[in-house]
Curated annotation (Swiss-Prot):
<keyword id="KW-0690">Ribosome biogenesis</keyword>
<keyword id="KW-0342">GTP-binding</keyword>
<keyword id="KW-0677">Repeat</keyword>
<dbReference type="InterPro" id="IPR032859">
    <property type="entry name" value="KH_dom-like"/>
</dbReference>
<dbReference type="GO" id="GO:0043022">
    <property type="term" value="F:ribosome binding"/>
</dbReference>
<dbReference type="InterPro" id="IPR015946">
    <property type="entry name" value="KH_dom-like_a/b"/>
</dbReference>
<dbReference type="InterPro" id="IPR027417">
    <property type="entry name" value="P-loop_NTPase"/>
</dbReference>
<dbReference type="InterPro" id="IPR006073">
    <property type="entry name" value="GTP-bd"/>
</dbReference>
<feature type="binding site">
    <location>
        <begin position="183"/>
        <end position="190"/>
    </location>
    <ligand>
        <name>GTP 2</name>
    </ligand>
</feature>
<comment type="function">
    <text>GTPase that plays an essential role in the late steps of ribosome biogenesis.</text>
</comment>
<feature type="domain" description="EngA-type G 2">
    <location>
        <begin position="177"/>
        <end position="352"/>
    </location>
</feature>
<dbReference type="GO" id="GO:0016887">
    <property type="term" value="F:ATP hydrolysis activity"/>
</dbReference>
<feature type="domain" description="KH-like">
    <location>
        <begin position="353"/>
        <end position="438"/>
    </location>
</feature>
<dbReference type="GO" id="GO:0042254">
    <property type="term" value="P:ribosome biogenesis"/>
</dbReference>
<comment type="subunit">
    <text>Associates with the 50S ribosomal subunit.</text>
</comment>
<feature type="binding site">
    <location>
        <begin position="230"/>
        <end position="234"/>
    </location>
    <ligand>
        <name>GTP 2</name>
    </ligand>
</feature>
<dbReference type="InterPro" id="IPR005225">
    <property type="entry name" value="Small_GTP-bd"/>
</dbReference>
């Protein structure tokens, strides 16, 4: 059963995101002294007096301006309100009621959900009561004076809110796969998200950077739940100004860190850029599973060699992610978009997979019999005593050898390929830890001969 939803509504820069962060108990929505910082619907879990619910942060509502993406923001806010069981209308107690507040209040009175009026920026309790009293004229009932930044007054607001929230009992835990969607600005990340969801969930605009928060959306396919995290586009450092974009990029990096699988979205027209390479490096650094999604494939002129040539370019420019699955899609038309989730599920399973020590050593025995470890100039050969998986997410295998320095990069890559080919680790990095160990220590530490690597 889904959690009930509470929509946070208001004009720009009244403190909606600050209130969401207060209710959710963490800074997730981007807060900055700039109107219009929040553009998409951002869902965060909250809890009060035994009731669980989701608070939805929306963009600032402006009814009399159709420039840029303001009509899209209105659509997002309206969609959030349509799925909510209650709404909090946030106003600015320091400025008093405005014509924009009046317009929103008139619209809110026409909605089916109960509306609570939160008068924010009431930092002084005594003055706050007087500031809040001015908002009775909006016709939405009792105004609640609060300070979202300090937390004062929010308890009374929440006490009333939970009266309008249905209790959620026995919510089943979902075995969800967390998927971060990352890439440079304007490569089609939000369009891809919308193609998954089937609605305009994230704002899509040709204006670069229309997504600023890391936004969570939960979908289900064939009994599997996926949490999709759309993120702000990541640009080169020299193009980043301190402010909302700086915080957005930090959000994107955090999204990579908490994801099971990362979709690295590339622009088929632009090809692989230096920034794409750096993003891929960040994904590897965090040890995440990865799918390379080449978007806008419909915009590329093709012949029978196009996809082959593009794959060669990927192998050359992103050679360190050769283990990642690649798919060519069009988020705009939906071409092959659903196939992405199949690859995600496989990669997530590989990412958390554990393999028994006996199976690992069977693979090593075969690998050594096919290709012996290299020998040093003095004729001393490298020996692999045994291997064992020490962790997952990503799969990490410790290999105990006589001298790790005797195994060059080529042989190490060969062993990794053998694990992938024989154990099916698709879409996930594998970490091999080469540990030098004296012969006697290896024998003592590996009493079970069934797990010993047979050396030819």
């Amino acid at each position: 059963m889904a959690l009930p939803i509470v929509a946070i509504i208001g004009r720009p820069n009244v403190g909606k995101s600050t209130l969401v962060n207060r209710l959710a108990g963490e800074q997730t929505a981007i807060v900055h002294d700039e109107p219009g910082v929040t553009r998409d619907r951002t869902y965060m879990p909250a809890f009060w007096n035994g009731r669980e619910f989701l608070v939805v942060d929306t963009g600032g509502l402006v009814f009399n301006d159709d420039t840029e993406f303001l009509p899209l923001i209105r659509q997002q806010a309206m969609t959030a309100l349509a799925e909510a069981c209650a709404a909090i209308f946030v106003v600015d107690g320091q400025t008093g009621p405005t014509s924009a507040d009046q317009e929103i209040a008139e619209w809110m009175r026409q909605q089916r959900v109960p509306v609570l009026l939160a008068v924010n920026k009431c930092e002084s309790p005594d003055q706050g009561l007087m500031q809040a009293a001015e908002f009775w004229e909006l016709g939405l009932g009792e105004p609640y004076p609060i300070s979202a930044i300090h937390g004062s007054g929010t308890g009374e607001l929440l006490d009333e809110l939970v009266n309008h929230i249905p209790a959620v009992e026995d919510i089943p835990e979902t075995n969800e796969i967390k998927v971060a969607i990352v890439g440079r600005p304007n490569v089609g990340k939000s369009s891809l998200l919308n193609a998954f969801v089937g609605e305009e969930r994230a704002i899509v605009s040709p204006i670069s950077g229309t997504t600023r928060d890391a936004i969570d959306t939960v979908i289900e396919r064939d009994g599997q739940t996926y949490r999709l995290i759309d993120t702000a586009g990541i640009r080169k450092k020299k193009h980043i100004e301190y402010g909302t974009e700086f915080f957005s990029i930090n959000r994107a990096f955090k999204a990579i860190r908490r994801a099971d699988v990362v979709l690295l979205v590339l622009d088929a027209v632009d090809g692989v850029t230096e920034q794409d390479q750096k993003l891929a490096g960040r994904i590897i650094e965090e040890g995440r599973a990865c799918i390379i999604v080449v978007n806008k494939w419909d915009a590329v002129e093709k012949d029978s060699y196009t996809i082959y040539d593009y794959e060669k370019t990927l192998q050359s420019r992103l050679h360190f992610t050769e283990w990642a699955e690649t798919i060519f899609v069009s988020a705009l038309s939906g071409q092959r978009v659903e196939k992405i989730l199949e690859l995600v599920k496989t990669a997530a399973e590989s990412h958390k997979r554990r393999v028994s020590t006996s199976v690992i050593n069977e693979v090593l025995t075969d690998a050594v019999s096919w290709h012996s470890p290299p020998a040093s100039r003095g004729g001393r050969q490298g020996k692999i005593y045994y291997g064992t998986q020490v962790s997952s997410q990503p799969p990490t295998i410790a290999l105990f050898v006589n001298d790790s320095k005797r195994f060059n990069d080529n042989y190490r890559r060969y062993i990794e390929r053998q694990f992938r080919q024989q154990l099916g680790f698709k879409g996930t990095p594998i970490i091999l830890l080469w540990r030098s160990k004296k012969v006697r220590d290896a024998e003592i530490g590996n009493v079970n001969r069934a797990t010993r690597v047979k050396l030819s």
